[in-house]
Amino acid sequence: MAIYGIGTDIVQVSRVAAVMQRTNGRFAEKVLGPDELRVYHARHARSQARGLAFLATRFSVKEAFSKAIGLGMRWPMTWRALQTLNEPSGRPTCVASGELADWLAERGITSRVTLSDERDYAVSFVIAETPDTAD
C-alpha cells in the first residue's frame, strides 16, 4: 500500500459541549451518520460525559479523514457520509457511504484510523492508502 495522505485532528470536548448546548443537541444530528447517532444516544443516555466524548472523537475523525484525502469538508466529503464504527474486536474503522464511497472507490483509497479521548480532549489520526503501483 502507498500512503495517499495523512490527517490528524484534536478537539476540545468543552467546545463540543458548548456547540451542543447552543444548538439544543442538533449538532449531533448534523455531523453523525445513522449508526453513529444510535451509539451516541445510547452512550449519552448512560452518561452525558460519555456521549460528548463519543461525539468529539467522531467529529475529530471526520476532520482528520477530510485532511487525509485532501478535500477538507468539500464535496463529496460531508459530515454524515463518513462514519467511524467499531469492528467486533473494538478496532475503529471508517465507513463511507454515497458519493464519498464512490469517490474513494474510484481512486482505490482505503483508510486506517486511530482515536483517543481524555476528559478534556479527543484526538484522531487517519492514514489514507492506495494500492502500491510499483512493479
Swiss-Prot record:
GO biological process terms, semicolon-separated: fatty acid biosynthetic process
EC number(s) per entry: 2.7.8.7
Annotated compartments: Cytoplasm
InterPro entries given in the database record: 4-PPantetheinyl_Trfase_dom, 4-PPantetheinyl_Trfase_dom_sf, ACPS, Ppantetheine-prot_Trfase_dom
Catalytic reaction annotation: apo-[ACP] + CoA = holo-[ACP] + adenosine 3',5'-bisphosphate + H(+)
Enzyme class name: transferase
Cellular component, GO annotation: cytoplasm
Single Gene Ontology MF annotation: magnesium ion binding
Keyword vocabulary terms for this entry: Cytoplasm, Fatty acid biosynthesis, Fatty acid metabolism, Lipid biosynthesis, Lipid metabolism, Magnesium, Metal-binding, Transferase
Amino acids binding Mg(2+): 9, 63
Cofactor(s) of this protein: Mg(2+)
Signal sequence annotation: none
Keyword Cytoplasm: yes
Keyword Ribosomal protein: no
Role of this protein: Transfers the 4'-phosphopantetheine moiety from coenzyme A to a Ser of acyl-carrier-protein.
Annotated family: Belongs to the P-Pant transferase superfamily. AcpS family.
Protein name: Holo-[acyl-carrier-protein] synthase
Organism annotation: Paraburkholderia phymatum (strain DSM 17167 / CIP 108236 / LMG 21445 / STM815)
Taxon lineage: Bacteria, Pseudomonadati, Pseudomonadota, Betaproteobacteria, Burkholderiales
Originating gene: acpS
